[in-house]
Amino acid sequence: MAGGPANWARAITGGSVVIGFGYLLLKTATPNEQQLYDSLSPDLKRRVDAQRSSQADSERSAKVKEEQSKRLV
């Protein structure tokens, strides 16, 4: 006998438990951004800081160019 409401309920419940456990495991095992940064070696921290600074500079430059182009129009 295939199918039946009991089999569907058991399958949905089992699937929900597996998905819920996987989500909980993901949330507890994955470090947040600050924890990941704190675990880096000093050399890698310097590289990350330099990259963040470069990214911030390029974003500021893009904003300035955008404002200048708006003034010209």
From Swiss-Prot:
Subcellular compartments: Mitochondrion inner membrane
Region (Disordered): 47-73
Residues that span the membrane, as ranges: 11-30
Bilayer topology annotation: Single-pass membrane protein
Pfam families: CBP4
Keyword Metal-binding: no
InterPro entries linked to this entry: Cbp4
Compositionally skewed regions (Basic and acidic residues) per UniProt: 57-73
A GO cellular component annotation in the UniProt record: mitochondrial inner membrane
Coiled coil: none
Keyword vocabulary terms for this entry: Chaperone, Coiled coil, Membrane, Mitochondrion, Mitochondrion inner membrane, Transmembrane, Transmembrane helix
Function: Essential for the assembly of ubiquinol-cytochrome c reductase. It has a direct effect on the correct occurrence of the Rieske protein, core 4, core 5 and apocytochrome b.
Family according to the record: Belongs to the CBP4 family.
Protein name from the UniProt record: Assembly factor CBP4
Gene designation per UniProt: CBP4
